[in-house]
């Protein structure tokens, strides 16, 4: 979900903005703002994860991504919507990493955290491939990125719901003799 959205934006935002009549400058601004505000969002989410439920934070984060993408693609393209998207999507860009890592560590412990997070990151890369590929596929076959954006919105809504039933309590392990 996250990988799909990040790679869709990172790969296809220049073409999308060109299609919307705003040239390369808007994509440059968006990507620069995403990079800047990603730092703030990731640090902020790390802090919030020490104070609040990580699954709730992830649910809110993914729901906000859906809203931000909707605002961005359904409002008329402009300098202001580009700035809005760059700042807000940047705040949410990789802010999923601290609570996701913390949930994995909290539930499974830290002994195998590198292996478990490797599995999480592998699934992220499958999503990244899909975001890059499907963005191009839809554009080449339908002349628009709309379907890719709709998938990104749907994945955000799905992710916001699927995190809610997570039991954040550590798994009970039976010690072997």
What does each model-identified segment do?
Residues 1-45, 131:
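Extracytoplasmic gate region of multi-pass secondary transporters
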Residues 24-25, 110-120:
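Loop-to-transmembrane helix entry/capping segments in MFS-fold secondary transporters
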Residues 42-53, 139-140:
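Helix-to-loop junctions at the C-terminal end of transmembrane segments
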Residues 56-71:
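Structural signature of the two symmetry-related core transmembrane helices
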Residues 81-95:
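Hydrophobic core of transmembrane alpha-helices in multi-pass small-molecule transporters
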Residues 95-108:
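Intracellular juxtamembrane helix-capping segments at the cytosolic ends
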Residues 137-155:
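A membrane-interface helix-boundary motif in multi-pass transporters
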Residues 153-177:
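Multi-pass alpha-helical transporter architecture, strongest
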């Amino acid at each position: 979900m996250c990988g799909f959205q990040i790679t869709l934006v990172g790969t296809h935002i220049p073409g999308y903005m060109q299609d919307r009549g705003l040239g390369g400058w808007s994509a440059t601004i968006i990507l620069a703002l995403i990079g800047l505000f990603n730092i703030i969002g990731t640090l902020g989410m790390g802090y919030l994860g020490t104070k609040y439920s990580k699954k709730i934070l992830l649910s809110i984060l993914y729901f906000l991504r859906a809203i931000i993408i909707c605002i961005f693609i359904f409002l008329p393209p402009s300098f202001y919507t580009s700035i809005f998207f760059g700042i807000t999507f940047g705040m949410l860009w990789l802010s999923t990493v601290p609570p996701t890592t913390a949930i994995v560590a909290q539930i499974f412990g830290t002994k195998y955290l590198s292996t478990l997070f490797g599995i999480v990151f592998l699934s992220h890369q499958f999503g990244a491939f899909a975001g890059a590929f499907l963005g191009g596929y839809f554009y080449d076959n339908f002349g628009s990125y709309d379907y890719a954006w709709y998938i990104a919105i749907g994945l955000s809504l799905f992710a916001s719901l699927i995190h809610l039933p997570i039991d954040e309590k550590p798994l009970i392990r039976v010690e072997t003799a």
